[in-house]
Amino acid sequence: MCAALVASTVLAVPAWADLKLCNTTTNRVGVAIGYRDTAGGLTTEGWWTLPGQTCETLFKGALPSRYWYVYALDYDGGGEWAGQAYLCTIDKAFTLKSGGDCAKQGYNRTGFFEVDVKQATDWTVRLTDPGEGGGGAK
């Protein structure tokens, strides 16, 4: 009975993790992320600029959401890593707590790709050149 109590207590503790993104290309990329915050609201944030062959932690601490959304733009070579999850962005550094019609709010409608971190205690998204696997298509 004690073992069952300990196990359920351990499972109830929130996992501390960081969301990291690695740019494995040789080009500079701009990155934006989206997620549901602890209150259930939609948050999008950007822009991080990552030089080629570097990694950066985009979110520190307990991940408030199982599903994360990533959009990246190749500043040097053109192209993007995008998907079918449309979220709001703007052209300068931002944190938006919004949803709904991006255009009506004066924002850009941007297609992000979805990342399911499941119950991971640490997660890294890797941006790769076409044909190398990794996060989204360029």
Protein language model annotation of sequence segments:
Residues M1-C2:
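Bacterial N-terminal signal peptides that target proteins for export
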Residues V6-P14:
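C-terminal segment of classical bacterial N-terminal signal peptides
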Residues V13-C22, T26-G61, A72-K138:
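Intrinsically disordered, low-complexity segments enriched in small/polar residues
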Residues L63-Y67:
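Extracellular Ig-like/FN3 beta-sandwich strand-entry sites
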